Amino acid sequence: MPTDFLFTSESVTEGHPDKIADQISDGVLDAIIAKDPQARVAVETLVKTGLAIVAGEVTTNCYVDIPKLVRSTICRIGYTDSSMGYDGNTCGVMVAIEGQSQDIARGVDNKKDQGAGDQGMMFGFACDETPELMPAPIHYAHAITRRLADVRRKQHPWIRPDGKSQVTVEYRDGRPARIDAVVVSTQHSDEVSNKKIQEAIREDVIAKALPKKLIDNKTKFFINPTGRFVVGGPMGDSGLTGRKIIVDTYGGMGRHGGGAFSGKDPSKVDRSAAYMGRHIAKTVVAAGLARRCEVQVSYAIGVAEPVSVMVETFGTATVPEERIALAVRKTFGLRPREITEYLNLLRPIYQKTAAYGHFGRTEKEFTWERVEEKKDALRDAAKSATPSGGRRLKAV
């Protein structure tokens, strides 16, 4: 990777159609897991003008009023008027849910040694570009969309729920030096002028969300570059669970295994192992073992022990990389049940993750972001680890 380059990441607001779908799916998960923590949940949502469809596989002994939950989620996001093309009070809700396959349950529902819910590879990433140990482009893109939603609720009622941001950061010698370009698109009511939109977004959103030291007279701003954005939300585009996986993670800076998070209970390693990968990578960076770290974990369906674990530090490690890999295996349990218990994942915490990123958050529910407990233990383990035969070992 070059040391001088531009890197761009995007974020979307909670009112983006795909994020509506994610929040509905995770809302269903939360409602079920609150009553039945051992439930198996895999729920997808499709939203379009006047309609929400919830489908998937659920095994539980509890009852949840899914149509009521769907409507309340849509209204909370801000779609409460038919003039927006989507109204949680009146939209149709269809539900198509069956039980989990017994073939899958046979390998997963083992109380002694719970197997992975599916095969696949998951990645975790961290770097020292921000206090949250997240890449700068996605961090600032999320800051804009969060601020946009806050301003919509508290200051400018003509802003509507759908919106996007994009931030391009210029790197010099591998470090963020300045913000080169900012793109903000926000849905709005029909009567507001373009001038008012430009001024409000520039002054009340961008200026409050981004650090002044990274903005200069060469920074480019693109605010509603098409000119108008009245038709938005599910009326403008259909929304589907799991279509914003890069927004959900590292903005493209770290790799992604392809599995979405929302609507999946912790037995699905697509979610739980990705959270654990982030926790491990963040702990590595917080412990001072590297400035940049990526962790890959892979699983076979029905098998508890991971098939492989890989640690990559991109030449930034302060101790030999193979020692970090060995220390990771010594310090962290990576079986699905160990991950679930360690991160305390059997709680209704997931709807909050479904907008503005699953990582780099400071709320108490995001246990995978807390690194103090294992930081010293990992550092000590890395210093004392002895690679077998002196050979370079990254996958164990």
UniProtKB/Swiss-Prot annotation:
Record flagged with keyword GTP-binding: no
Keywords: ATP-binding, Cytoplasm, Magnesium, Metal-binding, Nucleotide-binding, One-carbon metabolism, Potassium, Transferase
Binding sites annotated in the UniProt record for L-methionine: 57, 100, 237, 268
Root EC class: transferase
Catalytic activity: L-methionine + ATP + H2O = S-adenosyl-L-methionine + phosphate + diphosphate
Signal peptide positions (record): none
Residues binding K(+): 44
Binding, Mg(2+): 18
Example of a GO biological process term: one-carbon metabolic process
Binding locations of ATP: 16, 162-164, 228-229, 237, 243-244, 260, 264
One Gene Ontology MF term: methionine adenosyltransferase activity
Co-factor: note: Binds 2 divalent ions per subunit. Binds 1 potassium ion per subunit.
Official protein name in the record: S-adenosylmethionine synthase
Gene of this entry: metK
